[in-house]
């Protein structure tokens, strides 16, 4: 059997990953040993290469992904039926810093972006309607419909309302999270102009909310409180939107250094190829971007469980290490406070694709942030302050996490997927497939195919093409989610609803 039928990711691994469906009785040559497969094993799934006793750790990516539930023989298909997570509660961690040099040259690349008055740069120039409360979602959608009909979006990239269910009937942390995310959307550089649309009586009081925006551009961000309008709020809203649209229409793209790019890193519908193709590809891009002076952000904190020490030891200093420890343990406490196990993460789709435990998922997931040092740690709803690689507190849920990334200031999100997903958040959400079958079957969803990495294409060649693609999207080329009109936001909720 040819070597290309499987891959051993790390020399220390006790499993190999099948690159194609393999049949019971087939043989593979691994480290000078002939191993006979004991079961039919799907592509992306793991085959044990040594006999192990019950309780023995199984290694992949060079780290434990769980332990054997029973004695296992070489050639066995390793999956959730015979592999158990090692994850439990919160842990105490020790800072053992790792200083790894990237040694990536600066290339002085540029993209065509929109430079805002405050110096931030957008990759889109859109007019947005942001409801302060879900009660006015319908009004917001109607205003967008009217403005689109009247203008045809001529001279700008899009007109959109970001509807949500919150802004009232919330308390403490949930209420503050909603306000922070809505604030972040209003201040996002991809918006050329924003109408903040309020009902008037909601918990998220309009005057207080506008104060949260700080020193904002009063010409480009306007407030309309619908309960204060005598008569037709649509007529009043259109007056404001016409003015905002006229201003945004004057904005033009200009050459901007790639150091101004801020990119979110996300995965969803992951499979056994995620940690082999798409995530390492995104990791290579992330390192390249950081070396250019740009910024990348990794979130999905629960999907760091099992790989967290790798990130902790890459923190630039002890203060960042301590923040990362809190990031991890706070999310574990969140799980435990709801009576949920911290390791119960892989979805049915993950398992069908070859991911058996949360450690298995996490070690693949964190490939997306490459090898760069961690230079910043953000709480949910915080806006970026530091260039380089940042970690952001948010759950693994695709819509919530992608919204959180965009809210922090990312102009676009890189989203790797092995199973496929059409959704997008309020910034361009590029889908990178882990396998070529997905790219072939869902070209309307997928922006870039990383599956070529197991088909003979060299990483350096694919990274070069990937960089070109990202710069093209940053310069105005539509991501597939934009072309399809699949754009939405989702805000994290933890507490009661009144």
Write out the residue ranges for each language-model feature.
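Metallocofactor- and cofactor-centric catalytic cores in central/energy metabolism, strongly enriched
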Residues: 2-412, 419-422, 427-498
């Amino acid at each position: 059997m040819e070597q290309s039928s499987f891959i051993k990711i790390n020399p220390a691994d006790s499993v190999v990953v099948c690159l194609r469906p393999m049949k019971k009785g087939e043989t593979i040559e691994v480290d000078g040993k002939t191993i006979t497969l004991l079961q039919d094993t799907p592509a992306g799934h793991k085959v044990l290469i040594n006999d192990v006793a019950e309780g023995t750790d199984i290694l992949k990516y060079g780290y434990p992904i769980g332990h054997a539930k029973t004695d296992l023989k070489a050639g066995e298909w390793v999956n959730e039926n015979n592999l158990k997570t090692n994850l439990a509660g919160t842990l105490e961690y020790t800072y053992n810093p790792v200083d790894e040099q990237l040694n990536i040259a600066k290339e002085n690349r540029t993209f065509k972006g929109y430079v805002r008055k405050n110096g931030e740069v957008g990759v889109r120039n859109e007019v947005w309607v942001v409801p302060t409360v879900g009660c006015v979602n319908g009004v917001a959608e109607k205003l967008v419909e009217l403005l689109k009909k009247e203008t045809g979006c001529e001279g700008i990239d899009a007109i959109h309302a970001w509807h949500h269910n919150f802004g009232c009937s919330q308390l403490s942390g949930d209420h503050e999270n909603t306000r922070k995310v809505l604030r972040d959307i209003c201040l996002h550089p991809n918006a050329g102009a924003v109408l903040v649309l309020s009902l008037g009586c909601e918990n998220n009081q309009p005057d207080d909310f506008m104060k949260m925006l700080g020193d904002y551009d009063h010409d480009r961000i306007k407030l309309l409180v619908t309960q204060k309008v005598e008569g037709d709020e649509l007529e009043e809203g259109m007056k404001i939107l016409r003015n905002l649209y006229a201003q945004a229409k004057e904005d033009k793209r200009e050459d901007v250094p790639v150091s101004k790019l801020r990119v979110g890193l996300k995965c969803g519908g992951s499979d056994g190829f995620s940690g082999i193709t798409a995530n390492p590809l995104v990791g290579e891009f992330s390192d390249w971007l950081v070396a250019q002076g740009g910024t990348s952000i990794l979130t999905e904190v629960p999907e760091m469980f099992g790989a967290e020490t790798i990130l902790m030891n890459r923190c630039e200093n002890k203060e960042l290490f301590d923040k990362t420890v809190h990031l991890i343990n706070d999310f574990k406490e969140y799980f435990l406070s709801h009576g949920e196990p911290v390791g119960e993460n892989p979805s049915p789709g993950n398992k069908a694709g070859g991911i058996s435990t949360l450690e298995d998922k996490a070690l693949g997931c964190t490939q997306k942030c490459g090898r760069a040092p961690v230079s910043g740690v953000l709480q949910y709803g915080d806006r970026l302050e530091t260039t380089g690689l940042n970690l952001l507190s948010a759950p693994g849920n695709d819509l919530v996490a992608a919204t959180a990334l965009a809210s922090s200031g990312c102009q676009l999100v890189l989203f790797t997927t092995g199973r496929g997903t059409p959704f997008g958040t309020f910034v361009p959400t590029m889908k990178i497939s882990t396998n070529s079958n997905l790219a072939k079957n869902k070209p309307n969803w997928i922006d870039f195919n990383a599956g070529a990495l197991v088909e003979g294409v060299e990483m350096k060649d694919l990274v070069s093409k990937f960089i070109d693609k990202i710069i093209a999207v940053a310069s105005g080329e539509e991501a597939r989610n934009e072309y399809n009109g699949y754009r939405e936001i989702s805000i994290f909720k933890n507490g009661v609803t009144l």
